């Protein structure tokens, strides 16, 4: 039988061609946009190549769900990276938020959280993410002020900057965002007054959490225009009247104003029938408890302790289900579950 001996040089050439063909086939079958992949690899580098991002490999497809925290748009089959979760990474040393995030122009959702070694301000590059709906930067050491340039991202629905090292004052400009539904800025070092413009958020806006900061001054009268389902301004240094947050014509479910220096007549406020949580402890609130509290069938959380309230606790509804601690240390509040009035 005749045997054919392929020369070594030809064999090597065939091997090289085979490798090229395999690589070409892989490249052609890859769904990940090459610009998105390059941006992700740069983000990884900018964060010091943490071991938790070891799945981000240049030889694999970033849209095959093996890249930790990366999702691509499969609905429209554009396969652009539209969802990025950068949470819980152990950075080898302090790094800022990568400006290379701006090179992911189709991002809809960005979560950056639980990274102690993430420092510095929120970079202006974020403003280039013009399709961003949900922005979360939480539980980091990111510092500086909440930037005005966020108002350029008209698509924003949710802003959550909770538990960072942010300081400065609240940016008035974000109230112009037409699609914003809620802000969560609790657990920072934000100071100064709440801007009057925060009473002019769109009708879509229903949630405001700015607790555990250093806010001063009064709650703007413009807040009467808001219809908030949830508001938490607790643990600040706010003063004056908070009655603008209440109203029988509103859909308010929770109001948390504890540990401020608020001073208003509680008896005169209107109550939303949907109210299920009310925390007013440690203020200077006076008057009597409104009779309307007995009509709130969803009320399951109440604390009005450490105020200047007087009179008898109304009987009925859920009011007697709360223990003494919910009513304690007022000026002259009495009746069940407190001692009887005399």
From Swiss-Prot:
Disulfide bonds join 32-62, 63-72, 310-332, 334-341. Keywords: Cell wall, Disulfide bond, Glycoprotein, Leucine-rich repeat, Membrane, Plant defense, Repeat, Secreted, Signal. One of its GO terms (cellular component) is membrane. Its main location: secreted. Glycans are attached at residues 64, 141, 303. It is a peripheral membrane protein. The keyword RNA-binding does not apply. Residues 1-29 form the signal peptide. Found in suspension-cultured cells and to a lesser extent in hypocotyls, leaves and flowers. Coiled coil: none annotated. LRR repeats lie at residues 82-107, 108-132, 133-156, 157-180, 181-205, 206-228, 229-252, 253-275, 276-299, 300-319. It comes from the Eukaryota. One of its GO terms (biological process) is defense response. InterPro entries: Leu-rich_rpt, LRR_dom_sf, LRR_N_plant-typ, PGIP. It is found in: Secreted, Cell wall; Membrane. Pfam families: LRR_1, LRRNT_2. PANTHER family: POLYGALACTURONASE INHIBITOR, POLYGALACTURONASE INHIBITOR 1. Belongs to the polygalacturonase-inhibiting protein family. Inhibitor of fungal polygalacturonase. It is an important factor for plant resistance to phytopathogenic fungi. This is Polygalacturonase inhibitor 3.
């Amino acid at each position: 039988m005749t045997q054919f001996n392929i020369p070594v040089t030809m064999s090597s050439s065939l091997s090289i061609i085979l490798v090229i063909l395999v690589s070409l086939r892989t490249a052609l079958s890859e769904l990940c946009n090459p610009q998105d992949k390059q941006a992700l690899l740069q983000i990884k580098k900018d964060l010091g190549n943490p071991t938790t991002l070891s799945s981000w490999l240049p030889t694999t497809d970033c849209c095959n769900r093996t890249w930790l925290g990366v999702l691509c748009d499969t609905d429209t089959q554009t396969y652009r990276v539209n969802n990025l979760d950068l949470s819980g990474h152990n950075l080898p040393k302090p790094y800022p938020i990568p400006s290379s995030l701006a090179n992911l122009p189709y991002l809809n959702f960005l979560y950056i959280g639980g990274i102690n070694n993430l420092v510095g301000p929120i970079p202006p590059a974020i403003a280039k993410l013009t399709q961003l709906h949900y922005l979360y930067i939480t539980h980091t050491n990111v510092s500086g002020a909440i930037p005005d340039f966020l108002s350029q991202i008209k698509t924003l629905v949710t802003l959550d900057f909770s538990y960072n090292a942010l300081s400065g004052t609240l940016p008035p400009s974000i109230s112009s965002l037409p699609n914003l539904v809620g802000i969560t800025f609790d657990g920072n070092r934000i100071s100064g007054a709440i801007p009057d413009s925060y009473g002019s958020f769109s009708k879509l806006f229903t949630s405001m959490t700015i607790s555990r900061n250093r806010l001063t001054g009064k709650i703007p009268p413009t807040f009467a225009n808001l219809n908030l389902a949830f508001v938490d301004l607790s643990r600040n240094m706010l003063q004056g009247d908070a009655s603008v947050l209440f109203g029988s014509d509103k859909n308010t479910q929770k109001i948390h104003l504890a540990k401020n220096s608020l001073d208003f007549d509680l008896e005169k406020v209107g109550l939303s029938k949907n109210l299920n949580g009310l925390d007013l402890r440690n203020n200077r609130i006076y008057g009597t408890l409104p009779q309307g509290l007995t009509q709130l069938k969803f009320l399951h959380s109440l604390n009005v302790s450490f105020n200047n309230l007087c009179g008898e606790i109304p009987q009925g509804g859920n009011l007697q289900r709360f223990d003494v601690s919910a009513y304690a240390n007022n000026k002259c509040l009495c009746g069940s579950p407190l001692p009887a009035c005399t």
